[in-house]
């Protein structure tokens, strides 16, 4: 699944 998801928003690095 892509990064920046509702579950992995922190993996985006924002």
Swiss-Prot record:
GO terms for cellular component: extracellular region. Keywords: Amidation, Disulfide bond, Secreted, Toxin. Expressed by the venom duct. The modification Isoleucine amide is found at residue 14. Transmembrane segments: none annotated. Signal peptide: none annotated. The keyword Secreted applies. GO terms for molecular function: toxin activity. It is found in: Secreted. Contains 2 disulfide bonds. The cysteine framework is V (CC-CC). Belongs to the conotoxin T superfamily. Negative results: does not have the ability to interact with the G-protein coupled somatostatin type 3 receptor (SSTR3). This is Conotoxin tx5b.
